[in-house]
């Protein structure tokens, strides 16, 4: 597959900062303002998996709005079944996703009632390398649920919960409490990978070189840091100290 950045294509900040251009073959459709309120009202009324979004900043986004976006999502299994791009990668990552028992025990101590909202795209290399591990962790946690939305219904979440260098990206993961309020977030990549990814590349390093190095990191890590950071996010929420780099 062609190399595609997992970010919003309408993000001029990143283009100006890096001198790169945006891929146009997989644009993120951001709903126009005049359609946002009807979409949210339909989802809140229990109208099924209708895409929903909000123009309110996510850091002060009403819980019922996040609940509407969450309700617009599907289970990971449904997302996996519908995946078209990187289908083999999604299935292989899911099949091989193992967990450290100690991480599961820590996550169980965080209690129940949490809901995880993941904004992901099937073609995104970061999504396919992390979301299956998040789903595997949730599978082991009674009373914790995961829903996945694509970048259409999740566009406003991506706009407001941006990466450290200001990009709207996939995956963007929010942790919601039982009331639907955001109590944690995780954006794009595990922290140690992201630190390298956001650093200036070596002069001789091509985009393809960087992508190959990134995917080699994911293969070596095998989801361990993603799962650890999910557990730390759950622990932070349970302790009343949300973990969210966008705050």
Task: Describe each model-derived feature in a short phrase.
Residues 112-120:
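Short active-site neighborhood of thiol/selenol oxidoreductases, capturing the structured segment around
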Residues 148-171, 176, 197-201:
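Thioredoxin-like thiol-disulfide oxidoreductase module
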Residues 49-112, 160-166, 183-247:
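Non-globular targeting/processing and membrane-anchoring segments
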Residues 121-129:
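Conserved redox-active cysteine motifs that mediate thiol-disulfide chemistry
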Residues 128-139:
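Typically the conserved alpha-helix immediately C-terminal to a functionally engaged Cys/Sec
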């Amino acid at each position: 597959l062609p190399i595609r950045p997992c970010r919003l294509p309408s993000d001029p900040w990143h283009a100006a900062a890096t001198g790169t251009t945006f891929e146009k073959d997989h644009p993120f459709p951001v709903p126009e303002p005049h359609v946002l309120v009807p979409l949210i009202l339909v989802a809140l009324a229990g109208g099924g998996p209708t895409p929903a979004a909000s123009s309110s900043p996510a850091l002060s986004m009403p819980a019922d709005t996040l609940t509407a976006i969450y309700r617009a999502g599907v289970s990971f299994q449904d997302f996996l079944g519908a995946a078209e791009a990187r289908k083999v990668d999604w299935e292989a990552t899911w099949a091989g996703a193992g967990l450290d028992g100690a991480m599961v025990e820590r996550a169980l101590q965080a209690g129940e009632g949490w809901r995880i909202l993941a904004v992901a795209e099937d073609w995104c290399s970061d999504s396919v390398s992390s979301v299956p591990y998040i789903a595997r962790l949730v599978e082991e946690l009674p009373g914790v649920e995961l829903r996945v939305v694509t970048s259409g219904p999740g566009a406003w979440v991506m706009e407001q919960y941006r990466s450290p260098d200001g990009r709207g990206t996939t995956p963007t993961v929010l942790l919601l409490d039982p009331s639907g309020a955001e109590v944690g977030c995780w954006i794009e990549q595990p922290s140690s990978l992201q630190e390298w990814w956001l650093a200036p590349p070596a002069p001789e390093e091509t985009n393809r070189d960087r992508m190959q190095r990134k995917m080699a990191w994911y293969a070596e890590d095998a989801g361990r840091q993603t799962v650890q950071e999910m557990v730390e996010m759950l622990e932070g929420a349970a302790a009343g100290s949300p973990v969210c780099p966008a705050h």
